[in-house]
Each structure stands twice: as C-alpha cells, then as structure tokens.
Amino acid sequence: QLACRDRSRIALESDLLSAAMLGIDNILCLTGDHTKMGDHPQAKPVFDLDSVSLLHTVKLLESGVDLGGNELVGEPPKFSKGAVVSPCSDSVDAQLAKMERKVAAGAEYFQTQAVFEPEKFIKFMEKAKQFGKPVQVGIIIPKSAGMAKFMNNNVAGIHVPDEMLEELKADKEKTKAGITGVEIAARIIKECKPYCQGVHIMALGWESKIPDLDPDLCIRNRFCRDAKPRCLVRAFRQIQKL
C-alpha cells in the first residue's frame, strides 16, 4: 500500500523505484485518510498527489520517465497496479466515476472498503462489471459492537447494519472470543464471493482467525494457521488464485 497523505511526489517516486529494486511488484495506490482521523491529528498532511495521479506516476515510471521528465537509468520497473473503491458508499455513481478515472489512469485491479452490506456490494458489482477489472471484496472481522459503531461514525464508506450490531451485543463472551465476528465475516464472504474475484481480509490483529472464515480460503495451504506475516503473504497469493 502506498498512500499520498505523507509523501511528496519525489518521495513516492523514490518508494516506487526502491520497491522495484527489492522485487516488490504489487502496488495499491491510495490517497490516504486525513491525519485528523488518526492518532496523530496534529500531523501535517502532504497530498501532493492523489490516487489517480499516483497511478499515472506509476505508468510514467514504467515507460522509463519520472514526473520531472527525467529518463530512468536501466530497465524501467513493472508493477501490478491496484486501487480502492467503496461499493457501499452513499453515492454509487460517484464511486463508479472514481473507478472509471482510476482504470483510465492504469488501475489493473481493485480492493474495496470493508463490506458489511452484501446486497449493496452485489448491486455495485453489477454496474462495475463494465470496467472488466478484478475486484477483491474487503472483509473486516468485527471485534465488538463498539468497534462497529466507531466505524459507522468515523470511517467513510462503511456502514454496519443495526441487526449486526445487535448480533455483536447479544452474547458478549461469544463476541469477545471472536466467534460472532467470524460468523458475520464468513457470512459476508459467502454472499459476496460469487460476484467478485478475490477476498481481501483485514484481520486487524485476528490473523489466527482467518482459517475459520471459509475453508476454501485456507484449506489448500496451512500457512494461515501459523498467522505469521510471511505465511500470510503466501496464503493471500493462494486466495487470489481462487
């Protein structure tokens, strides 16, 4: 993930070229949330570029030229360029317009904001098919009703329905153990999988619960059981192939 919030265009180009040298070829281009939403609200945001212009920058580097018009030395980098979209946003048309601009700028795949309303996701995907780009549905395992309320109030593009809030409140011990959250997330995955090309799990510290979400996600490998970063990367590559 490469966010524009904290970096100038020079820093972003530097990070991209460094990533290429290290063999990192999958890039997710993000504008980034404003610093006021994080735990350092006094920090000054940069936003020299946004996600669309960052995608354009990546394409430019791939052609062998940087944003200053300088030719790169050696073989140009080659990336798999991703972007994000919020299918459950209040304005679907605005999200589709953003998606179109990102595709035009070079986006090859999309990851979505966390989905808690499968019916909205399915309707969005019916319209997003026109772009012909693979989409990975975003899944968060909700840890508590408080967490769900926080996301409703503070995270754009996310809405946890009232019935899910009540489900998280119903049995506090079950919720604390992660059972309720896994049940909710697994249900969402099951409903959304036929309409997308992958699943992006944002476990937020509950990586060990990933195998419980859907046997199809992890049964072909045992890496997720270890819940270690390197193993999870391999597991994610397996998920992408499903």
What are these regions (language model features)?
Residues I10-L16, S91-R101, V182-I189:
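Short, acidic/polar
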Residues N221-L242:
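N-terminal low-complexity segments that are often proline-rich with Ser/Thr-Pro
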Residues G32, P45-G74, V84-S89, G132-I188, ...:
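Active-site pocket-lining/capping segments in soluble small-molecule metabolic enzymes
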Residues L2-T35:
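A generic, well-ordered mixed alpha/beta core segment in the N-terminal half of proteins
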Residues A3-R5, C29-T35, A114-V115, I140-P142, ...:
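Short, ordered loop/turn segments at secondary-structure junctions
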